[in-house]
Amino acid sequence: MAAPDYALTDLIESDPRFESLKTRLAGYTKGSDEYIEELYSQLPLTSYPRYKTFLKKQAVAISNPDNEAGFSSIYRSSLSSENLVSCVDKNLRTAYDHFMFSARRWPQRDCLGSRPIDKATGTWEETFRFESYSTVSKRCHNIGSGILSLVNTKRKRPLEANDFVVAILSHNNPEWILTDLACQAYSLTNTALYETLGPNTSEYILNLTEAPILIFAKSNMYHVLKMVPDMKFVNTLVCMDELTHDELRMLNESLLPVKCNSLNEKITFFSLEQVEQVGCFNKIPAIPPTPDSLYTISFTSGTTGLPKGVEMSHRNIASGIAFAFSTFRIPPDKRNQQLYDMCFLPLAHIFERMVIAYDLAIGFGIGFLHKPDPTVLVEDLKILKPYAVALVPRILTRFEAGIKNALDKSTVQRNVANTILDSKSARFTARGGPDKSIMNFLVYHRVLIDKIRDSLGLSNNSFIITGSAPISKDTLLFLRSALDIGIRQGYGLTETFAGVCLSEPFEKDVGSCGAIGISAECRLKSVPEMGYHADKDLKGELQIRGPQVFERYFKNPNETSKAVDQDGWFSTGDVAFIDGKGRISVIDRVKNFFKLAHGEYIAPEKIENIYLSSCPYITQIFVFGDPLKTFLVGIVGVDVDAAQPILAAKHPEVKTWTKEVLVENLNRNKKLRKEFLNKINKCTDGLQGFEKLHNIKVGLEPLTLEDDVVTPTFKIKRAKASKFFKDTLDQLYAEGSLVKTEKL
């Protein structure tokens, strides 16, 4: 493995492929702010020496020094096959280093913003109001000083003592990021709580981490008050939102269920404004983190048992930032402009934390939804007009359905749109890059594409990142043409600080997660009991190692030893395939398989992934097989906007049905359900007949966190789902196969 401090700038200085980039940087002192800013303007690395060269071989196999049977070769990015990169530069080895760089270089740029509410009318203003990087830097240091002062006074410790964990419980908002930056400035570790992680889980995390402080949104007040008696170590409760003097007095004197914690420390409510004021009048010098400082403990629920706390260091996040810089491109005409991103996905999950880390490193303005409701996303996108946004497949499929429904309102409009989209799709397939044709800019954009982009608030958008779940290739191809935007699908886990690979935006053959990035290496391990042989067909369990990968679970050596071997390889539990270009595709999940009555092996996650990635008519799926039966049944979430038109082709009355009526009729009308089932089965050419569903129960969102059948990242808790849906599954088997006579 590479030395932990190998920098992106070291790679550029030493690799002859980047000679032209090295020449451009020669006029600056290496590592200076001016050098780094010029470097940012010349990236990504994939442009050197030629982008087309990179596309042909994105990752390369290096020798397997251990020569172990049952493993593939080790794969590294073709950009950095000799060493793994752990930072952009040796002056930028932590997330705090990156933020402070941006605050120095672009102090007046917009940093954190939200839509203000007009208190007189109670309506939200049609604009975002931002605080600058300079202001955010000042505020986060004041908040950090205030946290240390208040907590340590209660603990009777020196004010600069930073040996504790800060817990955060809130929806996305600027105060979330301010708190995170305050922790970075004083080398404080934080952890995020979220109510959907499971009953009593927040209390479990607070007590496991021994966090003395909880910073929360006012909307979580009831939950916090309910938890107080079970919080053993919390002495400071901080509400992010404004609290009046009377509200604070009532909380501390009347509503607080207990007055002291288990250490006999008094528990007190504060507002974040008070904490900031304390820090302003009692400034404590910053305590910058080192690469080995523990940045965050990110709890991942998994599909069984208590959540595991993934320890992520500043080296992990700095490595992830370096990977992002190596692959993202900002065009020359945008480099000196104020650009924006929308913080939409939950900050309690590592995916959005990684996105925001990059945003803060490059000087983006970060906007937040005006209320924690995903249905207002498009409304706020239209106002912010972001340059980039990270979205999950469920949102993209809704975009697809909405666009198609809008285009279907007239025959002429539909025919014009189909002509344009077919032409663009052909150009993408032929070129393998963005459509730079005159026809695209003078005709296609004016007639169709600009209108679609404006309707979704994506008029300034350059790329969309997606991950966390499979996405249909048809959805990717359609949106790429309809929006003329590169969509990049990534792969990563909490343990790898989100994405370690990312597909290229305009590749001819979509569907992979791209090649391993510059901050990690990977290999495949054979899973013979599932028929995967890594050393023969490059299919097996994906293992990852490198500076972007975690080292341990918090206070959990047993789970750590199961996940990470003595050589540092983290076993992901995902079965992957590596193609001839070095790109990774996830195809299955280790250990989740069973037999049907005739002896066929069934891998339900593989089947679910194929349905979700191939069929635009569904949003969720749980595949179930009774070992005493000969066929599969399932619980399916239906995308009504996408499904309604295909069913209405034979049944015009379907167009008049509400979403609820459509779902009700699908479940009640066996003939209609059979037609829908045949439609979704025809999408899944990659499945054998015995792997396809024979009967289904549909719903709008049948797999919910509230029913405890999925994790917060929507992985199925298979045992709990089987129990929860037992009666329904039994009914489906009693009804029998709907497709026995069909050719599957």
Curated annotation (Swiss-Prot):
Residue numbers binding ATP: F299, T300, S301, G302, T303, T304, G305, L306, P307, K308, G309, V310
Q: What GO terms describe the biological role, i.e. biological process, of this protein?
A: fatty acid beta-oxidation; fatty-acyl-CoA transport; long-chain fatty acid import into peroxisome; long-chain fatty acid metabolic process; very long-chain fatty acid catabolic process
Q: Which signals induce this protein?
A: By oleate.
Report the domain of life of the source organism: Eukaryota
The protein's annotated catalytic reaction(s) are:
a long-chain fatty acid + ATP + CoA = a long-chain fatty acyl-CoA + AMP + diphosphate; (9Z)-octadecenoate + ATP + CoA = (9Z)-octadecenoyl-CoA + AMP + diphosphate; hexadecanoate + ATP + CoA = hexadecanoyl-CoA + AMP + diphosphate; (9Z)-hexadecenoate + ATP + CoA = (9Z)-hexadecenoyl-CoA + AMP + diphosphate
Q: Which cofactor does it need?
A: Mg(2+)
EC number from the UniProt entry: 6.2.1.3
| Renumbered ranges of motif FACS | 567-617
Q: What does the similarity note say?
A: Belongs to the ATP-dependent AMP-binding enzyme family.
User: What does the record give as the function of this protein?
Assistant: Activates endogenous medium-chain (MCFA) and long-chain fatty acids (LCFA) by esterification of the fatty acids into metabolically active CoA-thioesters for subsequent degradation or incorporation into phospholipids. Preferentially acts on C9:0-C13:0 fatty acids although C7:0-C17:0 fatty acids are tolerated. Is the main if not exclusive MCFA (octanoate, decanoate and laureate) acyl-CoA ligase. Required for efficient MCFA beta-oxidation inside peroxisomes. Facilitates the transport of MCFAs into peroxisomes by passive diffusion, by decreasing the intraorganellar MCFA concentration.
Indicate what this protein is called per its UniProt record: Long-chain-fatty-acid--CoA ligase 2
Q: Which organism is it from?
A: Saccharomyces cerevisiae (strain ATCC 204508 / S288c)
Lineage of the native species?
A: Eukaryota, Fungi, Dikarya, Ascomycota, Saccharomycotina
